[in-house]
Amino acid sequence: MKLPIYLDYSATCPVDPRVAEKMVQYMTMDGTFGNPASRSHRYGWQAEEAVDTAREQIAELLNADPREIVFTSGATESDNLAIKGAAHFYSKQGKHVITSKTEHKAVLDTCRQLEREGFEVTYLEPESNGLISLSKLEAAMRDDTVLVSIMHVNNEIGVIQDIEAIGELCRSRKIIFHVDAAQSAGKVAIDVQKLKVDLISLSAHKIYGPKGIGALYVRRKPRIRLEAQMHGGGHERGFRSGTLPTHQIVGMGEAFRIAKLDMEKDYQHALALRNRLLDGVKDMEAVTINGDLDQRVPHNLNISFAFVEGESLLMSLKDLAVSSGSACTSASLEPSYVLRALGLNDELAHSSIRFSFGRFTTEEEIDYAIEQIRVAVAKLRDMSPLWDMYKEGIDLNTVEWAHH
């Protein structure tokens, strides 16, 4: 067993060896290294063929047309292209956008930028289980609403939004619907023939592919138009200029192919590990699971350990690679904005840890993690005067603290 144990799959996944093996064939003189846009010789044709194959593999996971897949540098760029691209293109029809407070920063900060440009953005509060209420969403819709952006699976708490119902609602009001599916692709079935979703952001490194490559699904029927954010040689049908990185694209395609093949197996594996971890800690006192337990992917468990400071718990769990919040915000000392939006107080939000597992996690590693968690939490609580007061039955909300 290799220490520290990697339990941060929601931040990034290791590249599947099958993917790495495939990528190596597209870099050197021995392989297919050409520029896919070089139309005058075989090196270019072979690279273009490899890109086309990958585009088909990605489209297959979504049941989409390969022509609806636009390559980007990752889900962050896809979010930017989808939100800014649609908002700007359709700004004559209205300047109102709806999203939720628990979205990824790539969506929230893009919406903030639109606000600086004169758009109006409504940020929906989720329910305490992390789900978005359809009636609240409908109530927020206006005649000048042009775009709704709601993520499929949350990166911190793993809850699955009902994008089918949200899509129906948006389509009935002729509003463009964007979904960030970085955390759901390969974990939950996505069928764009059934779902009324217009734009979908995808990432390779959350699905055992390489970092630095992603895609944006752009619906053709009804056709969605976007204003390009990256200008140049007009690659990707003008949506996104820049030489295509064949090796990364091939890696993403292979990762999506394997994900489609192994989706059920990966799901059951993650579910068994999730239940094992949950069973190992649920009898501990003052432990809460954040986010709905049924409407969520099994790859994620976000747990608050009351009366334990999250940072000290992370330090105590030095043999576990876990995070408090998402990788994009884990460097800040602010409590998770996602957990605050669910209504958790600062103390509970600060005492939460995200465990996320995947294809290469073993039962042995989970058992070791359970043992480490139980020891660390008990030790830290022993040092906490608040824990003593709680054990004595004192309601800490009624305590008057002295202000110096």
UniProtKB/Swiss-Prot annotation:
Question: What's the cofactor?
Answer: pyridoxal 5'-phosphate
Positions of the catalytic residues: C328 (cysteine persulfide intermediate)
Highest taxon, organism lineage: Bacteria
> Which positions does UniProt annotate for pyridoxal 5'-phosphate binding?
A75, T76, N155, Q183, S203, A204, H205, T243
The EC number(s) given in the record are 2.8.1.7
Query: What is an example of a Pfam family matching this protein?
Result: Aminotran_5
Enzyme class comes to transferase
Q: Any idea where this protein resides?
A: Cytoplasm
> Gene3D superfamilies per the record?
Aspartate Aminotransferase, domain 1 (3.90.1150.10), Type I PLP-dependent aspartate aminotransferase-like (Major domain) (3.40.640.10)
Question: What Gene Ontology cellular component terms go with this record?
Answer: L-cysteine desulfurase complex
Q: Where N6-(pyridoxal phosphate)lysine occurs along the chain?
A: K206
Q: Which residues bind [2Fe-2S] cluster?
A: C328
Record's keyword terms, sorted: 2Fe-2S, Cytoplasm, Iron, Iron-sulfur, Metal-binding, Pyridoxal phosphate, Transferase
UniProt-recorded Gene Ontology molecular function terms:
2 iron, 2 sulfur cluster binding; cysteine desulfurase activity; metal ion binding; pyridoxal phosphate binding
Pathway listed: Cofactor biosynthesis; iron-sulfur cluster biosynthesis
Outline the subunit composition.
Homodimer. Forms a heterotetramer with IscU, interacts with other sulfur acceptors.
Family annotation (NCBIfam families)? IscS, PRK02948.1, PRK14012.1
Q: What is this protein called?
A: Cysteine desulfurase IscS
Gene (name only): iscS
